[in-house]
Swiss-Prot record:
The lineage of its organism: Viruses, Varidnaviria, Bamfordvirae, Nucleocytoviricota, Megaviricetes. It comes from the Viruses. Residues 26-35 have a biased composition (Basic and acidic residues). GO terms for biological process: regulation of viral transcription. Residues 1-35, 58-77 are annotated as: Disordered. Putative transcription factor. Keywords: Transcription, Transcription regulation. This is Putative transcription factor R430. Coiled coil: none annotated. It comes from Acanthamoeba polyphaga mimivirus (APMV).
Length: 257
């Protein structure tokens, strides 16, 4: 059987606060992730500097269009005034999104002992590397009582199979945060028209923003909701948000394992 090796990008510190906001219940509403610590609010995030930051990162300008006429990045002229969003909602959702982004994109601190326990459980099942997926990792975490890593199955899988874990730069994170501001304002503008009760799933949204910005190296680290209906509902909302902002729409057609 193929041997498993632990990569060097782990530390001895545990992350106790990693959580997952997904649900296995079928629903026709968008998932709700409103819990937030207001003391962590960063009120310095703005949308206004978006164009300058894009230029600094040498990304495509808002005028660059695909053959379909859709822009690969936000067009500043289409950004609604963020004063349309109640300030409490704007800053709480922005802060919670930042926390989730940091959880997903940072190199999560998994102890060597926990990783060895996961590896030993895999070996006891006589599984080959190509047989391991996030569902199996999730079941192993549950059996071992490692609930603090729930929602980070993809990250752990990448370590187990020896796949390099990409780290996101502060510039890339800041740009995603600014795009999130625009998404939040657009969502608030459209929610009455389409009867949206809750915000998009954060893992889904992070995945789509990375896809929009062509940050493809990070996609394998992002856990999507483990529910086809939730993905479908989020796809429908995201398609309308992209259409409103004249962005390219990428549909997620299936759950990643």
């Amino acid at each position: 059987m193929e041997k498993f090796f632990i990569t060097d990008n782990t530390t001895d510190n545990t992350t106790d606060n990693t959580t997952d906001n997904t649900t296995d219940n079928t629903t026709d509403k968008l998932t709700d992730n409103n819990s937030i610590d207001n003391d962590k609010i960063n009120k310095n995030i703005t949308v206004d500097s978006l164009t300058n930051d894009l230029n600094k990162l040498s990304l495509k300008s808002p005028s660059d269009k695909s053959s379909s006429g859709k822009s690969s990045i936000p067009n500043k002229s289409l950004v609604p005034n963020k004063s349309l969003v109640p300030s409490k909602i704007f800053f709480s959702k922005t802060t919670f999104f930042k926390i989730k982004l940091d959880e997903i994109m940072s190199c999560h601190n998994i102890t060597i002992s926990d990783l060895n326990s996961i590896k030993n459980k895999i070996e006891s099942k006589n599984l080959q590397i190509d047989e391991i997926n996030t569902i199996i990792i999730g079941k192993i975490l549950k059996k071992l009582g490692l609930y603090k890593y729930h929602g980070h199955e993809q990250y752990i899988l990448n370590i187990i199979i020896g796949k390099p874990v990409q780290k996101m730069s502060s510039q890339e994170k800041n740009l995603i945060m600014k795009l999130f501001d625009q998404v939040l304002v657009t969502f608030n503008l459209l929610k009455k028209k389409y009867n949206w009760n809750n915000f998009l799933h954060y893992g889904y949204l992070i995945y789509q923003l990375c896809k929009l910005l062509e940050y493809n190296d990070f996609l394998d680290n992002i856990a999507l909701p483990n529910n086809e209906t939730i993905i479908y509902v989020n796809n429908q909302a995201w398609k309308k948000i992209c259409s409103h902002n004249n962005w390219i729409y990428y549909e997620i057609s299936q759950i990643k394992n």
